[in-house]
Amino acid sequence: MATVREPTFLTAEEYGRLPANGRLTELVRGRIVELTRRFTAHGFYLNQIGFCLSSFVQQHELGRVVGGGAGMVTQRNPDSVRGPDVAFYSYDRIPRGPLPGGYWPASPELVIEIRSREDRWKEIHQKVGEYLGADVLLVAMIDPELQRVHLFSADREPMVFNATDRLTFPEVLSGFEIVVGELFD
C-alpha cells in the first residue's frame, strides 16, 4: 500500500531562520513565494513615503516606522509572512524601549505597499485582505504609474487619491497629510 505524504508547510519561525540567498521572498500559506525584483524607482518611492511618515511620527512621538520589506506574520496555520514596503507601529502596539526580536508580536496600524507593473490586482487584493485580517487598520497601495494611492480599511469602501489630492490617515496618524503628487517628485 502506498503512503500519502502530507504537504510540508513552513511556520513563520522556520521561514525566519532560512538564509535569504539573495532572493526576495514571502511565506504564503506555509509556502515560499519568490517575488519579482524591485527596480531603483521602487526604492525611491519607498524612501519618499518612509521619510515623510518617519519625520511626522518622530516629531509627534507616535511610534515607529519600518520599511524595506521587514516581515510581519499575517496569518497562522498555515503561516504567512508578508514584507510590507513601509509600516507604522504605534507605541500602543509596540511599546517604547528595546525592540522585540524576530517578527514583532503585534501588527502595524498602517501598511504601505508600492505597486510595480508586474503586480496584479487579484494578488494585491489578496494581500490587502491578509493585512486587514491581521488587525492592520489601513492599507495604502501606492501606484506610481498612475500617480494614485488606493486606501483600504476593513470598515469602509476603498478610497482613491489622485495626484492633486491630500492623502491623510486620520484613523492612525491624526494630522498627517501630504499631496499625493509629492510622493512622485
Explain the meaning of each model-derived region.
Residues 1-185:
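Gly/Pro/Ser/Thr-rich low-complexity, intrinsically disordered segments predominantly at protein N-termini
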